[in-house]
Design a protein with these regions (language model features):
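Phosphate-handling active-site elements
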Residues: 25-31, 60-69
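Acyltransferase
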Residues: 149-179
């Protein structure tokens, strides 16, 4: 089951009822779960805190695995384009959280950098697709990479869940979000 909510506030109010709705929709109980997968960030401070606290609580109380997935990886894996996929999340003050993905794998570690530094790292690349929170950066991206695809997309909880099925679980107590 999959549900998508795009809300700016009150994650703490809507998250558990949404989980409950999804579980009931597919006739599952919490005891049927064997793993909790959560976006580990980067992202909204409050949104990440709510999601991670909920995920840790569920994993701990149900004594099941917990897995964290990069929000940038989720953005990249939503894209089905050839070449380098560059997911971007606005970090304010002309800085971004950025990843570099090719063939479904991270080509570099996720970074926090100025947009100019990111564009400089990519010089010489022919086939680049920028995904994520790109609207504020579209003009600068198009000036440097006029042939690039630039797609405004959000991370998909479904994709995060898919990716998380393949990853190694983490210690529930040690897990912290990546802001």
């Amino acid at each position: 089951a999959d549900a998508s909510l795009t809300i700016k506030k009150n994650h703490s109010i809507s998250l558990m009822p949404t989980i409950d709705f999804l579980m009931k929709s597919v006739n599952l109980s919490p005891q049927d779960l064997d793993r909790i997968v959560v976006a580990e960030g980067p992202g909204s401070y409050t949104g990440l805190r709510v999601a991670v606290a909920t995920a840790k609580t569920l994993a701990y109380t149900l004594t099941i695995d917990l897995v964290g997935v990069s929000s940038l990886a989720a953005l990249a894996l939503n894209s089905h384009h050839e070449g380098l996929i560059v997911p971007i999340m606005d970090a304010r003050r002309n800085h971004v959280y950025v990843g570099f993905y090719e063939n479904g794998r991270a080509a570099k570690a996720d970074q926090y950098a100025s947009l100019n530094a990111v564009l400089e790292q990519l010089k010489g690349r022919k086939q680049v697709t920028f995904v994520g929170e790109v609207t504020a950066f579209r003009q600068e991206i198009n000036q440097t990479f006029p042939e690039a695809k630039v797609l405004e997309v959000l991370p998909s909880a479904f994709k995060i869940g898919q990716v998380g099925q393949k990853l190694t679980p983490v210690d529930v107590h040690a897990f912290v979000p990546k802001y």
